[in-house]
């Protein structure tokens, strides 16, 4: 990998590539004091967050799907092989031998709601309680939120927007539209997988 990027001189400074299920060591006494884990606790190669979510969701075959609603909206599935595609899916080796994970996602999930909270409810510690109450009420479903404040993999210059916003709309309508827009984006990613 270092040769591919033209930085062969750092090859001896990188950690070895291991499988996620390989035991690579144990928690030392000093590490246990620093992090609170018991000395001797095994340490494995591990996963990054989205793959860990898929594993903990029980995803182990192509007809199952993991949906992560974090900062990003991400759908993950598992296949027996990497499938060529013009679309830039993210592929990787899964923890089950002979399996690969495939991700489809974009920054169109909770990052949008967090932006709204920071802009319009910065001092309201109970804003999420209000939101839950508001979305349970009837709201104007013709107000559409495009959750692309932080980008999209649909197009490089696709902006976020509130489409159909009018003077009669309230913050309740806007919150409901944001929630619907986030769910819409999740469905787009799931459909692509």
Say what each PLM segment does.
Residues 1-8, 22-193:
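Active-site core segments that coordinate phosphate-bearing ligands/cofactors
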Residues 11-21:
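Short beta-strand-loop/turn "lid" adjacent to the catalytic site in phosphate-handling enzymes
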